[in-house]
A protein has these predicted regions:
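Gly/Gly-Pro-rich "capping" loops immediately C-terminal to redox-active cysteine motifs
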Residues: 82-106, 118-166
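Intrinsically disordered, low-complexity linker and terminal regions at domain boundaries
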Residues: 157, 162-184
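Electrostatic cytochrome c docking/interface patches
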Residues: 27-68, 85, 96-100, 124-127, ...
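Post-cleavage N-terminal segment of exported redox proteins
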Residues: 1-58, 78-81, 191-207
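Glycine-centered loop/turn positions within well-structured domains
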Residues: 70-73, 139-141, 170
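The canonical Cys-X-X-Cys-His
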Residues: 63, 69-79, 89, 188-195
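Active-site phosphate-binding and catalytic loops of NTP-dependent enzymes
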Residues: 111-115
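Sec-exported extracytoplasmic/periplasmic mature domains
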Residues: 47, 68, 106, 110, ...
C-alpha cells in the first residue's frame, strides 16, 4: 500500500463522496459491452417486476459485461477476479434471493457488512473524515476512502481525532445500475445469481 501524508484533507474528502459516480470507465476491460439503455432511476419494486417479467434465456456475455460496466468488478470479486473493497460475490446466488440482491444494489445502506463498513472520524478542529479503517497503531488510523482505489491509504493522526463512530452510510454508492435497461439489468442479475458460472441453470432455462 502507498501511504499519502497531506497537511490538508480536501483531496481525500473529494474522492470520498458522490463525485466517484463520475469516475472514468477507462479501466473497464477491453471488449466489454457497454449499456445501451435507456436507463432509469431503478427502485427495488420496479426492478423486481422488470426481472421477473423478462423472458428467454439470459445472456452470460452481456451479464458479465454489465458487471464490469457498472463498476461492480472494481469493488467485488467474482470467481477470483475483481476488486477487494466489497465482499466476494461468487456465492451470492446460493445465499440470497433476487429481491435481496436488487435491494442490496439499489439501497446499499439498508444493510452494511461489518467487515466492509466505513467509520466516521470527527476531528478536533471541526469537520469529519469518512473512510474504511484498514488498521491502526499507537499514532495513526490508516483508512481507505476510495473504494475504486483501495491501495490508496491515508494515515490520519489520532491526535487530530476527537471521536469515531460506525457510519450508517454504505461505501457502495446507489444508482450504479441506473444506466441499464430492463434486459441489461436482467442479464446482470442472472450473472450474479450464477456466480459467474456460464454453465449455471439460469442460462439454460426459459421463463
Amino acid at each position: 500500500n502507498t501511504f499519502y501524508h497531506l497537511n490538508t484533507f480536501e483531496m481525500y474528502n473529494k474522492i470520498s463522496g458522490d463525485s466517484i459516480v463520475s469516475i472514468s470507465r477507462s479501466g473497464v476491460p477491453a471488449g466489454t459491452i457497454m449499456p445501451k439503455g435507456p436507463g432509469k432511476n431503478w427502485k427495488t419494486t420496479i426492478a423486481m417486476n422488470a426481472v421477473d417479467s423478462s423472458t428467454g434465456v439470459r445472456s452470460f456475455a452481456r451479464g458479465k459485461s454489465m458487471f464490469a460496466a457498472t463498476l461492480c468488478s472494481s469493488c467485488h470479486q467474482m470467481k477470483g477476479e475483481g476488486g477487494v473493497a466489497g465482499p466476494d460475490l461468487s456465492q451470492l446466488g446460493t445465499r440470497f434471493s433476487t429481491k435481496d440482491i436488487l435491494e442490496s444494489i439499489i439501497e446499499p445502506s439498508k444493510t452494511i457488512s461489518d467487515q466492509f463498513g466505513s467509520t466516521v472520524f470527527f476531528l478536533k478542529k471541526g469537520g469529519s473524515v469518512l473512510g474504511r479503517l484498514i488498521r491502526q497503531d499507537s499514532k495513526n488510523y490508516y483508512i481507505s476512502q476510495n473504494p475504486f482505489a483501495t491501495d490508496v491509504v491515508r494515515a490520519l493522526s489520532k491526535k487530530e481525532v476527537a471521536r469515531t463512530r460506525v457510519s450508517e452510510t454504505s461505501p457502495m454508492l446507489p444508482g450504479m445500475i441506473n444506466g441499464l435497461n430492463s434486459e441489461e439489468l436482467s442479464d446482470l442479475i442472472a450473472y450474479l445469481k450464477a456466480g459467474g458460472n456460464k454453465n449455471h441453470a439460469v442460462y439454460t432455462s426459459k421463463k
